[in-house]
Amino acid sequence: MIKEINIKIKNFEGPLDLLLHLVSQYEMDIFEVPLVPVIEQYLIYIQTMKELELEVAGEYMLMASQLMLIKSRRLLPTVTETFIEDTEQLEYDLLAQIDEYRKYKMLSQDLDELHQERSHFYSKAKTEIITDETVLLQDKSALDLFLAFTKILELQRQHFQDENTKIAAEKFTIADKILELSTRFTEQKICKFSDLFSSSTNKDELVTTFMALLELIKNQQISFSQGELFGEIILERKETSE
């Protein structure tokens, strides 16, 4: 029942935007960033998009194929000096694209801030209309939530594969998981993101739990925060006003 909710990531404009976010987590010069871990995170992200039955645009898949080429060349034994030079050139070209995109984003943000300042003196800014059935991940912190789930999904997938015992397939619905999470947060105001998935028995339950969480976040029943880079995401029940 995964398709009950549609997910969109606002202001996430393409593969370079995702790569820039992944690279920025290292807080160092772009050309010094370890590229293989970034590539692995990107590929896991794409795989998770498919697991959630979300449409993956062609440009993401094209970038994925380029990244897989770079990663495979990194893993192959050194053949010739030309091979090394070609691989290094591929990596440099990719990082140069990301750096160029970063500069574009900075300029775009500056222009947007200028536009916002000018709009105060003129007409009211237009309002974006969002349909009720859409779960909108509104900023890059929400992207961090999504990326955190990709890591859990990858780890748990391996765990499920390693399990020798076969458990009868159980059907999970988003509605049931919403009720389960609501009950949990009634009893426990604060919870670690990773703890929500610790008792999941299969991939379907993982995904359904995540979709239910997104619905609760959309309805402003749950908030989330991340205290430090790569740190644990903390979920908290929002108090309802009487």
UniProtKB/Swiss-Prot annotation:
Record has Hydrolase as a keyword: no
GO process annotations (BP): cell division; chromosome segregation; DNA replication
UniProt-annotated location(s): Cytoplasm
Primary localization class, coarse: cytoplasm
Originating species: Lactococcus lactis subsp. lactis (strain IL1403)
Keywords (A to Z) from UniProt: Cell cycle, Cell division, Chromosome partition, Cytoplasm
Any one GO cellular component localisation term in the record: cytoplasm
Domain of life: Bacteria
Assembly: Component of a cohesin-like complex composed of ScpA, ScpB and the Smc homodimer, in which ScpA and ScpB bind to the head domain of Smc. The presence of the three proteins is required for the association of the complex with DNA.
UniProt family annotation: Belongs to the ScpA family.
Gene3D superfamilies: 6.10.250.2410, Structural maintenance of chromosome 1. Chain E (1.10.10.580)
InterPro entries (UniProt xref): ScpA, ScpA-like_C
Role summary: Participates in chromosomal partition during cell division. May act via the formation of a condensin-like complex containing Smc and ScpB that pull DNA away from mid-cell into both cell halves.
Protein name, per record: Segregation and condensation protein A
